[in-house]
Each structure stands twice: as C-alpha cells, then as structure tokens.
Amino acid sequence: MHAGEAVQQLKKAFETVASFDFRDALSKASTPVTVVATNGPFGLAGLTCSAVCSVCDRPPTVLLCINRKSYAAGIIKSNGVLSVNWLAAGQAVISQTFAGVGSVPMEERFADKGWQTIATGAPYRMDAAVSFDCTIANIVDVGSHSVIFAEVVARNHAEECTPLIYHRRQYATTRSLAE
C-alpha cells in the first residue's frame, strides 16, 4: 500500500465516525448553555446554542455555530446583531423554550420582562450569568452550520450565580472542587 491509499483509508475510517458517534462523543463534554437572540429590520428571533466560545479579547470576539436551516439563522445573519446569553442554573426552561420545546411562538419567548436591550437592539437576558451584545464581524459556512464571529460591544453579568451546563444530554450545574 502506498501513502495515498493509506490516507484514503484513514479518511474513510474517520468518515464512519461522523454523525451519531461524533455527537455521542461530544455529549460527554460539558458545555455552557446559551441562548442567542437578535432583533432588527429582519425580525426578532432566538435559539439555544451549545457551540459558543471566546476567540480573542482584542477586539473582544466570540464565535458561535448555528444550523443554517434553523428559523433564527437567516434572521440573525440578516440583522447583523446578536446577543449571547450564558444561562444561570435556574434557567433550563428558557433554554428548552428557545430549543423549540413546547412550540412557543417566537414573540412569546421574549414576552417576560427579563429581556432588555443595551447597545445594538438585540435582546439580552438581564438575569443570565453573562450576556454579550454583539455585532457580526464574519460568517463562514461549514457543512450544515454557519460559524459566526461576533464582536462584543457591551456586556452584562450577574454578580453571583451558578452557571447552567449541558452534560450527557441533560442539564446540570457546576460545583467548586474546593468545597
């Protein structure tokens, strides 16, 4: 077997890992629970997003990955602004609502007074562990998802809170090892 055949066999082996095995492996990694929201000329929308992380602090930038087929994806990209809200321990219902559980209409998802705006007009959750108000800096499409790079223009955070995380396909919280 020559090197080209070996590379092709490796590629094929990795392709078989894809969908189910990939998602199953990632379910064992804990992730913060976030809701991404937008409002602007193209409408009001939001979704629960598990793929969010920091990129750099100069300029302060985060990235998030959203399925291009989701209702909110096109609205978020068209508005050009968004908020990223890392939820606190008692906010699993908010996560479920924005994930589509219960088929709550989009406008009703934002009906309670916990949603406000800072700079861009994108709604942020006042009682979230952390909320960033952002403008979209870049979008890269990869497979089924859009990777959105968003520059942070304002922030809000709770003084004391326990974050909500998702681990092994269920909600959980963190606990300090020093206790």
UniProtKB/Swiss-Prot annotation:
Q: Which residues bind NAD(+)?
A: 54-57, 145, 166-169
- Which pathway does the database say it acts in? Xenobiotic degradation
Question: Catalyzes what?
Answer: FADH2 + NAD(+) = FAD + NADH + 2 H(+)
List, alphabetically, the InterPro entries matched: Flavin_Rdtase-like_dom, NADH-dep_flavin_reductase, Split_barrel_FMN-bd
Single Gene Ontology MF annotation:
FMN binding
| Gene3D superfamilies referenced in this protein's UniProt entry, alphabetically | Electron Transport, Fmn-binding Protein, Chain A
Asked whether the UniProt record includes NAD among its keywords, one would answer yes
Q: Which of this chain's residues are annotated to bind FAD?
A: 48-51, 65-71, 99, 104-109, 144, 166
* Highest taxon of the lineage: Bacteria
Root EC class: oxidoreductase
**EC number, UniProt record:** 1.5.1.37
Please list the GO biological process terms of this entry: pyrimidine nucleobase catabolic process
Q: Which UniProt keywords apply?
A: Aromatic hydrocarbons catabolism, FAD, Flavoprotein, Monooxygenase, NAD, Nucleotide-binding, Oxidoreductase
Q: Which family does it belong to?
A: Belongs to the non-flavoprotein flavin reductase family.
Please describe the quaternary structure of this protein.
Homodimer. The chlorophenol-4-monooxygenase is composed of an oxygenase component TftD and a reductase component TftC.
Please describe what this protein does.
Answer: Reductase component of a two-component system that degrades 2,4,5-trichlorophenol. TftC provides the FADH(2) required by TftD. TftD oxidizes 2,4,5-trichlorophenol (2,4,5-TCP) to 2,5-dichloro-p-benzoquinone, which is chemically reduced to 2,5-dichloro-p-hydroquinone (2,5-DiCHQ). Then, TftD oxidizes the latter to 5-chloro-2-hydroxy-p-benzoquinone.
This protein is called NADH:FAD oxidoreductase
Gene field: tftC
